[in-house]
């Protein structure tokens, strides 16, 4: 167990909870180590926090909470890169963009989901090859 | 940066297994065909840049706004 300084404060992170993004994320290529943090107060929003830069955290959410129809294909190369052997052992989140001081305009990036192999501890933001989704789906459009 | 001129139907090799062929030139637009192994990632640059820009925006939240956002669950 190690203590990391993160945007959400100091966190005790077990080795098993460290997710390695071998190529970082677009715009944050230098950052490799992240962890997904669940805070009771913010659920269902969770947090993808950098363990290397305490200023970086992404609000994320399970896409199927928003829309049951969300689907995408993981390419062979990504399956290989993430060492996915068992489909049941992956987790998927999408990133929320919450405009500062204007949370009603929150959007969801369904075009580039975060895929994590819970077994290998490897993660990646996958860019989907589809026109079905964009980087900016209004969160309010998912409300019933 | 290597700059070279190609005509329609001509191609270049990058390494041993990537071939880039000029298929069609029409005004300001060039149609290119790329043959490459699956392991080679091919991405339109503006798409990568769009994700990059969105990620940079996504870290600019105000933690005080979160409660407002998570409310959507109580529907």
Curated annotation (Swiss-Prot), chain B:
GO CC annotations, alphabetized: cytosol
HAMAP family per record: CsrA (MF_00167)
Complex formation: Homodimer; the beta-strands of each monomer intercalate to form a hydrophobic core, while the alpha-helices form wings that extend away from the core.
GO biological process: bacterial-type flagellum organization; mRNA catabolic process; negative regulation of translational initiation; regulation of bacterial-type flagellum assembly; regulation of carbohydrate metabolic process
Role: A translational regulator that binds mRNA to regulate translation initiation and/or mRNA stability. Usually binds in the 5'-UTR at or near the Shine-Dalgarno sequence preventing ribosome-binding, thus repressing translation. Its main target seems to be the major flagellin gene, while its function is anatagonized by FliW.
PANTHER family named in the record: CARBON STORAGE REGULATOR
Superkingdom of origin organism: Bacteria
Name assigned to this protein: Translational regulator CsrA
Pfam families given in the database record: CsrA
Sequence similarity: Belongs to the CsrA/RsmA family.
GO terms for MF: mRNA 5'-UTR binding
Compartments reported by the entry: Cytoplasm
Keywords attached to this entry: Bacterial flagellum biogenesis, Cytoplasm, Repressor, RNA-binding, Translation regulation
Lineage of the species this protein comes from: Bacteria, Thermotogati, Thermotogota, Thermotogae, Thermotogales
